[in-house]
Structures are given as structure tokens and as C-alpha cells.
């Protein structure tokens, strides 16, 4: 079903984004990777360099896609995470998380809608269980993921009002063993080691398989949100 489909993935150079891009390539999709580190993209992915903290670069990147007949799927995967408490956190980290996790997701969605075919496209947002419950000391990261959840629901409602056939979905994973997790626990490596010892974490391939299931859902079916955790992650 994905053969020949044009799929744009943000943050496709590592972690979940890279795993999804590889799974899509195996299905015959035309994958476009929008990220800063294009040298780390998987072979076969069309590179599209962009700093997602800069709105003008996002606009320019999507303008360069105007030559495509249409874009079929947008996967908003890019994200950053800092364990930055409200009481003592660094406002510069808050600002960066908000720019990438929230603003860029909204802007990419806005631009992608203009490239979707009249029959509708599909937007898949990679969120987090932190968008459903707030972990201790991770309040501001959770705030960005609650915002992603709100944007996902709001966009779906807007498109229904507009009688659009575009589908909007999200995946909210628990712990996934990626470089993002190392970034999140920076300075608290002992805590991360303890978590890794106690929890059999999800893999990037787990998320990729779920993403393909959502994108391949039958016409007329919209999977709204999939919450995922390993069987031994309690919360």
C-alpha cells in the first residue's frame, strides 16, 4: 500500500525517525528526511536540510517540495528532551523544546496540508506517554507533549469541519532506547542505568512497526492515538 507514496519524516537521521524511514523504504515508499544532520540519513532517503527551530527554514524546505505531484504522509517525529524541572530548569532548554516539539510540528503540519492530494493525506505525530501523565522533574518536557496532544486533536477537529479526508494520528510511546533518552537523563546517568536495568524498553523497530500499521489502516479508518509501553513499564 505504501509503494510509491511520498512520505516526509522530520528527525529522520537517528532513533525512531531512522527506524521508520528504513521500514518505509522496505515498503517501497519515497522517503524524504527533513533534519539538520542529513549525512546520517539512511541510504535511499531523499535529504532535505532544515533547522526546525527556524520557521523560515521550515517554509523554505517545504517550498522546495512544490515540484512533487503531492505529498501523501507527514510524520512529525523530531523532538528534543531535557529533564528540566519547573523549579530549577533552564529557560533556554524550555525554549528549545517548545520550538522543536511544538512550533515546528505545527508549522510542518500547516505546510504539508497544502501539498496533500485532494483525496487527503495523513499526518502522524510521534508524541510520548509524557503527554498523558507528568513524570517527576520532567514537567516542561511533558508540557510540550501535552501541547502535541492538544494540537493533534485540534487539527483533527479543524479538518473535520472543513470536510477534509486527511487523517491525523499519533503514537505515544513510553521508554524507547534511543539517543533522546540519553539526552533526557544527561547528568543523571545513574538514574538512566537503573531504569534500563528495571525496564525492558521498547525498540525503535517497535515504533516503526506501529507507525506502518497506522499509515496502512484501511481507507475510512483513522487511528487517533496509540499509547505504547513495554510490558514491564508500570507508568
Say what each PLM segment does.
Residues 13-14:
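Conserved glycine-rich cofactor-binding loop
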Residues 27-41:
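Conserved glycine-rich Rossmann-like NAD(P)H-binding loop of the short-chain dehydrogenase/reductase
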Residues 50-60, 91:
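The beta1-alpha1 cofactor-binding region of Rossmann-like NAD(H)/NADP(H)-dependent oxidoreductases
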Residues 85-86, 90-96:
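Substrate-binding pocket helix/loop in short-chain dehydrogenase/reductase
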Residues 109, 144:
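Active-site helix of classical SDR
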Residues 128:
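Residue(s) in the substrate-gating loop at a strand-loop-helix junction
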Residues 166, 170-171, 190-235:
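C-terminal helical subdomain
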Amino acid at each position: 500500500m505504501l509503494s510509491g507514496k511520498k512520505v516526509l519524516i522530520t528527525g529522520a537521521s537517528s532513533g525512531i525517525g531512522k527506524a521508520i524511514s528504513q521500514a518505509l523504504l522496505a515498503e517501497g515508499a519515497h522517503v524524504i528526511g527533513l533534519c539538520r544532520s542529513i549525512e546520517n540519513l539512511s541510504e535511499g532517503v531523499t535529504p532535505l536540510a532544515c533547522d526546525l527551530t527556524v520557521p523560515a527554514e521550515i517554509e523554505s524546505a517545504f517550498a522546495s517540495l512544490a515540484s512533487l505531484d503531492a505529498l501523501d504522509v507527514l510524520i512529525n517525529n523530531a523532538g528534543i528532551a531535557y529533564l528540566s524541572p519547573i523549579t530549577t530548569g533552564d529557560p533556554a532548554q524550555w525554549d528549545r523544546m517548545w520550538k522543536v516539539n511544538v512550533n515546528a510540528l505545527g508549522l510542518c503540519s500547516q505546510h504539508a496540508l497544502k501539498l496533500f492530494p485532494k483525496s487527503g493525506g495523513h499526518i502522524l505525530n510521534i508524541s510520548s506517554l509524557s503527554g498523558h501523565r507528568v513524570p517527576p522533574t520532567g514537567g516542561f518536557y511533558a508540557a510540550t507533549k501535552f501541547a502535541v496532544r492538544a494540537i493533534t486533536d485540534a487539527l483533527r477537529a479543524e479538518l473535520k469541519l472543513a470536510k477534509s479526508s486527511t487523517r491525523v494520528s499519533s503514537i505515544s510511546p513510553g521508554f524507547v532506547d534511543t539517543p533522546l533518552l540519553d539526552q533526557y537523563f544527561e547528568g543523571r546517568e545513574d538514574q538512566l542505568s537503573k531504569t534500563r536495568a528495571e525496564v525492558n524498553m521498547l525498540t525503535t523497530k517497535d515504533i516503526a512497526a506501529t507507525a506502518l500499521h497506522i499509515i496502512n489502516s484501511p481507507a475510512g479508518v483513522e487511528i487517533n492515538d496509540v499509547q505504547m509501553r513495554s510490558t514491564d513499564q508500570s507508568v
